[in-house]
Amino acid sequence: MEKSQRLTQYSKGSGCGCKIQPAVLGNLLSGMRENGKVYPEILVGNDHNDDASVYDLGNGMCLLQTVDFFTPMVDDPEVFGMASAANALSDIYAMGGRPIMANAVLGWPVDEIDIEIAKKVLQGGLSCCDGLSVPLVGGHSIDSRDPIYGLSVTGLVEKAKLRTNAMAKASDYIAITKPLGIGMLSAAHKRGLSDEAQNKALYEILTQVNTIGASLADINGVHA
């Protein structure tokens, strides 16, 4: 596969590896809300380090909002689109909610990578959303140095079923919904060191949406 088609070669990091380091991000955001306006309807905001923000609608329901996008963690464009969409949608399910609509975020080096490959990325994201009956209603795109793709997702959750990181208790068991080691597989894939079977396993794991999060929120005794 030529570099023009190997999406992972167009970014320094891949997947979560492209995120700004926590210490740098903490410094960037420090003091942003000091003496700022307080919004009582916001139950979870950017000071909670959670999967999505939460707005209390006042009728027993809450609105969930998240945005997540990545640089390529795989070379297959459709899988990249599906994986990025799955990650964003999973944020809503993780808090006990269900996504109701999404918007796409696309950055693409239009002079470097064929636009037909970008179409495959978009198709992957749409396929993931359609598979869960989540309308992909629009989005925003820019001409960027690195290819990026993701979703901004809106969801709903019953307030009584809302689950946040802060609700976890010291005696809780931890349920792992995906196998560990995805980052290592992705790194091997980027370096061309993974075989066909490993790539297949990576694709299957990355495109799995954690819908089980919403189901677990229905169980008495599940705190976070």
Predicted regions and their residues:
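Helix-biased detector of long, well-ordered alpha-helical tracts
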Residues: 1-224
